From Swiss-Prot:
Membrane-spanning segments: none
GO (cellular component) term, any one: proton-transporting ATP synthase complex
InterPro entries with a match to the protein in the record: ATP_F1_dsu/esu_C_sf, ATP_synth_F1_dsu/esu, ATP_synth_F1_dsu/esu_N, ATPsynth_dsu/esu_N
Domain of life per record: Bacteria
Protein name: ATP synthase epsilon chain
Pfam families attached to this UniProt entry: ATP-synt_DE_N (PF02823)
Functional note: Produces ATP from ADP in the presence of a proton gradient across the membrane.
Amino acid sequence: MATLQCRVVSAREEIYAGEISMLIATGSEGEVGILAGHTPLITLLKPGSMRIQTPDGNEEVIYVSGGVLEVQPKLVTVLADTAVRAHDLDEAKIVEARKKAEQMLANQTETLQTNAALASLAESVAQLQTIRKYRNRA
C-alpha cells in the first residue's frame, strides 16, 4: 500500500511524525479519510478522535480539540489546538470536567457562562468518545 508522511503538532509539542497509510479525522464538513494520492486539501478540524494507520497495520488514536488539517501530495500536517494520544487521556478527570460543565449549565446566569459550559461539555464528550474508540481497538 502507498504511504505518505504525517506530522501532528499541538501548541505544546509534536505528537506524531512518521509514515502512514491512512488518516481519518473529523473536518468541518464531516469525517475525512486521507490516503496516499489524496487531492490537496485544507480543512478545519472539529474536536474528536483522529485515527492514524501505519504501514505495518498498527493504529494510533489521538484526540484533537480542533485545528487545521492540510494535505499535500506526500505530506499530511495536522496543526491542533490540543492533541493528546488516547492512551494518555485521564478518564476520571474528563468525567469530572463533564459533571462540572453540566452543573454550570444548570446554574447558568449569563450567556458567556453558558457558552463556556457548552464548550467544556463538548470537549469532555469528544474526549470520552476518543477513549471509547481507543479501548475498542486495543
